[in-house]
C-alpha cells in the first residue's frame, strides 16, 4: 500500500489534505515512509482544530507542525480540553504564525487576553472568532480583518464598544455578535461601510429606540449593500409593527438571506403573510431565503392559510404553528431538534409543509428526552444523537434502553438522570452499548454507599464522562473504571457540602491509570475549589 501511495502526484495529495484537519492528516499519513514525511513537513496549508481534540492528537500536532505551516487555528479551554491554551503557549508564540488567516478562541481561561494583544502582528489574519467565557478584553489593534465573530455568554451583558470601540472596522465584511445594545448597533452600522453580512441579538428597551431603529437610514450612514442579515429582537410588548420593519428593510435592495426572530408579543397584523409578501416583492427583489420565528397566540387558521399562497409555496417558504411554545416559524429551519415523550403528530391544519414532507419534523430531532412514566414513542427518530432519561425509576424503562442499538443507531450521548439504586446489574441483563461515547451521570454522587454496578460492561467505549461526586475516591474510581475515557468533568453533588481539596499530584498518586503516565504533560487538569468543587480532566489514551 505505501508503494502505491508513492505514485500519487504531490498536487493530488495536497488537494486531499485540504479536506482534513491537521491532526487527521498526521494521524493517517505520518511515518508511512520517508517520502510521505517529507510531503507533510513541506505542506503549508494546515488547519488546526483543537476543539474537543484527543490529548494524543494535540501532542502529535504540537510536536510535528511548525507555526509557519498553519493557516487556520482553533484553541479551546473547554471542559473537555482544560488548560489547552496554556499548554499551547508554552510551546508556541502566536506571532510566529505568520501565515495564519483564521483564528478561533473558545472560552480561554484569560478570555484570550494574552493572545489578542499580539494579533496586530499577524498581517495575513482575515477572520477572528472569539467565544467569551467571562469578559471581552480590550482589543487595541487588529490587522485589517474581514470577518469578526464574537460570541458572548447569555448571562453576561456589557457594552461591547468598551472592548472594540477604538478599533478600525472599515474592512469588516462579515460581523456576528451574540447581542448588542442599540448604541452598539448604530456604531457598527456607521463604522462598517463594506459590511455584507450581519448577525446579532438586538435589545430595544425603549419605544424611542424602536422608532430610531426604523428610521436608522435617515439618521446615519448604513451598509445598504448587505446580502445576509440575521436579527433577534427583544423590545417592549406590542411596540414593533410591520411599518417599523418596512422602513428598516426597504433600503436593503441587495438582501438575499434574511432571518428574523422576535421575542416580544406582537400584534396579529405583524403575522400577516400578505403584508410580508408585498414588502418582499416591492423592496427585496433578490431575497432567496427568508426564515422567521415569531411569538403567536391564535386559533384562527386564516393566519396559517395566508401562507399557502403561490408566492410562499413556490419559494418553498413553509411555515408551522406550535401551540405548546406559541410560536409561528418557518420549516425546516426552525423545526425543533429536541423533543420529549409527549410528542404529538403534526396536523396539516397548522403547517403549510406538504404532507409527504412531514417526516422532517421527526428527522430533524437529534435530542430525545424520556420523562417519568414514559410510553412508547409512535415515531422512529432515526437521527437522534443525544438521549436523556429523566426518570428516578430507571429500571421501568430499561426495555427502551435495550433498543438503542437498533432503533437509534446514531445515539452516542446518554444522560442517566436517575439514582444509583436504579442502576443495578439485574436491570441491565446482557445490555452492552459500545456506541455510547459520551456519558453523563448527574446523580452519581447522590449516595455515599457503594453500589455494585459494572459500568464498563454496559458502557465499554465511553470517552467523555460527566458525573457528580461526593468524595475524592469517587473521582479515582471513575478514572480507573472507564478504561477508554479521554476527558472527564466531575462536580460536587449539590446535596454534599463537604469541602474537597485535591491536587494534580494527589490524582497521579492515587489513580492507577494516571500513575502509569510517564510524560510530564500526559494529562491536564483544571481544579476549581474556591466556592464549590469541580474538576476538568484531559488524558491521553489508556495504554
Q: At which residue positions do the language-model features occur?
A:
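Eukaryote-biased activation of long, low-complexity terminal tails and linkers
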Residues: 1-543
